[in-house]
Amino acid sequence: MKYIGAHVSASGGVENAVLRAVEIGANAFALFTKNQRQWKAPALKADTIEKFKRFCKAHQFSPEHILPHDSYLINLGNPEAENLAKSREAFIDEMERANQLGLKLLNFHPGAHLNKISESECLARIAESINIAVDKVPNVIAVIENTAGQGSNLGYRFEHLAEIIDQVEDKNRVGVCLDTCHLFSAGYDISSLESCEQTFSEFERTVGFQYLRGMHLNGSKTPLGSRVDRHHTLREGTIGTDFCKFIMQDDRFDNIPLILETIQPEIWTEEIKFLRTLAK
């Protein structure tokens, strides 16, 4: 079965994200559990946690289909010791928040070397950051998102994801989220059914579908291999819609959250319906 939703607002409290997901006809969703542009946030209140869990149960959202995203400020591969420690502390807090809400996944961008350390050194720091976090917080899987490769961000090659996973001690506590806009911008062609087959076969060989815990379904405003991260709606932009058909008709993408981060929230309901029409 396909679980489709969007990254909905948690404004006014995380429990409201559940209701916003219901409004757009979703059976999966993503959210921030705190302000994503601040390092620190007030602790989640007991009544907020209770409401979130109650609303999820009432609307039949299971933890495997909810994909919280961490703060954009966090860089788990930071070359500077002080900033790395700050990022790790913030990431552990994000993991704890997800765990308090009964969630099983935490989606994050791997990190950037800032042109101060080598790629392999940065990837090793990211893996070490995951090891530290999962050692401190139980239950939650660290879900690495592939990137567009903008600036010095790593994670734009499948080999980067594999190198991080290889250095994570508990393989049950690490996973991957593939963003279609990022894939295309990083140079992985998904504009036809044939190119999708090639790209996802390469993912299987390099990383493995056993690690795929979620996807972000986005169109792109920029051409193949641009290394620029600019999302578009599903049916506009440079990729086309064959990738949507491929994903909706391939059972390797069953039972994971398929999340829209497309640029017009007012058409999310229609985009979800469109995806459902493509399913077998």
From Swiss-Prot:
EC number: 3.1.21.2
Annotated residues for binding of Zn(2+) 2: E145, D179, H216, E261
Binding site for Zn(2+) 3: H182, D229, H231
Enzyme class: hydrolase
GO molecular function: deoxyribonuclease IV (phage-T4-induced) activity; DNA binding; DNA-(apurinic or apyrimidinic site) endonuclease activity; phosphoric diester hydrolase activity; zinc ion binding
Cofactor(s) listed in the protein's UniProt record: Zn(2+)
Keyword Zinc found: yes
Residues reported in the UniProt entry to bind Zn(2+) 1: H69, H109, E145
Keywords for this protein: DNA damage, DNA repair, Endonuclease, Hydrolase, Metal-binding, Nuclease, Zinc
Any single Pfam family the record assigns to this protein: AP_endonuc_2
Reactions mediated catalytically: Endonucleolytic cleavage to 5'-phosphooligonucleotide end-products
Cofactor binding: number and manner: Binds 3 Zn(2+) ions.
GO biological process, one term: base-excision repair
Function according to Swiss-Prot or TrEMBL: Endonuclease IV plays a role in DNA repair. It cleaves phosphodiester bonds at apurinic or apyrimidinic (AP) sites, generating a 3'-hydroxyl group and a 5'-terminal sugar phosphate.
Family assignment from sequence similarity: Belongs to the AP endonuclease 2 family.
The name this protein goes by in its record: Probable endonuclease 4
Organism field: Actinobacillus pleuropneumoniae serotype 3 (strain JL03)
Gene that encodes it: nfo
